[in-house]
Amino acid sequence: MIAAGLSPVMLAACAPTVIPAGRTVTSPHLTKTAYVAADGTVLPLAVWPAEGPEKAVLLGLHGFGDYRDGFEDPAKIWSKDGITTYCYDQRGFGASPTRGRWAGIDTLVEDAITVANLVRAKHPGVPFYLIGESMGGAEALAAVDRGLQADGLILSAPALRGRVVVGPLASGALWFFGHTVPWLPSGPTSIDFRPTDNPKALKKLQNDPLWLHQTRVDMAYGLVEAMDAGYDAAKRVHLPYLMLHGMGDRLVPTSTVRTAIEIMPPRADSKLAFYEHGYHLLMRDKQGPVVAADIAAWIGNHEAELPSGADAEHSEPKLAALWGTKR
């Protein structure tokens, strides 16, 4: 009723702020510390080179509020396994120039595809994998669906709670606030939901100036846009994939994982892993090294059992049963 009383002009004036990529001014390229996009935007980049012979290369897409350092701990472990890891601050996050503003899923996905192409060109002949955490998982699915080339996909607590999952009431409320008061703080952040059981990691996040501690409603509205794209793309995933879920995750609940499993195509070279004591930020958890080791093992052999035994067949019974019907 309230929305019906607002004129189209008023709604347009209060539309969510989106800052997509601008016109092309340069050829996209990587430096030692940044990804320079075609529109000249400089996005900070972190690289953790493999120690010894390089067996694989990973490109990480971080989650909502996070930035490139979100992959620091696992990347150091993967480095010892011969895996090089790249991660850049996505537009709107970390030290990006448009921090706190949504870039739009099309721009975010195009960045991911471009960086993937640049990374693959720097490592010819080396197996290339895409890993996305939370929001990054949704973006990774969308990017693969739109042509990103990779040898496999790793989804850590993928955020797939789009409109189909949350329902019309919640999504309608978010649309209303996003189009009337887009500047309004969106409320509790992921830190308020205890995203990890690791007190040192949690304290670091709380004091990290590059973590996005407060977001606008229109950023949350954009996140739903990304989750919608990821959910839709999940139906058509055509790569080997490893999906990881912590049973203590308060941001991506088990029901969301079940919904995702129901629509993802069955593949003998893919795995679902449940961590009984895992939270949302699995790779920052106390058992983060265990999760990182599982990822490295899967990259080495898609069909072998994971070292931790977290494979769905050996963990949460109800979801394992559902997963079994998809094999």
Show where each model-derived region lies.
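Short alpha-helix in the alpha/beta-hydrolase fold that links the catalytic acid
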Residues: 239, 253-263
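The serine-hydrolase catalytic nucleophile loop
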Residues: 64-76
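Short beta-strand/loop motif that positions the catalytic acidic residue
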Residues: 237, 243-245, 249
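Alpha/beta-hydrolase-fold enzymes
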Residues: 133-216
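Catalytic nucleophile-loop/oxyanion-hole region of alpha/beta-hydrolase
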Residues: 65-68, 93-127
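An N-terminal hydrophobic leader/cap segment in hydrolases
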Residues: 5-37, 41-50, 319-327
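Conserved alpha/beta-hydrolase
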Residues: 75-99
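Catalytic active-site module of serine/aspartate enzymes centered on a nucleophile-bearing elbow/loop
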Residues: 271-327
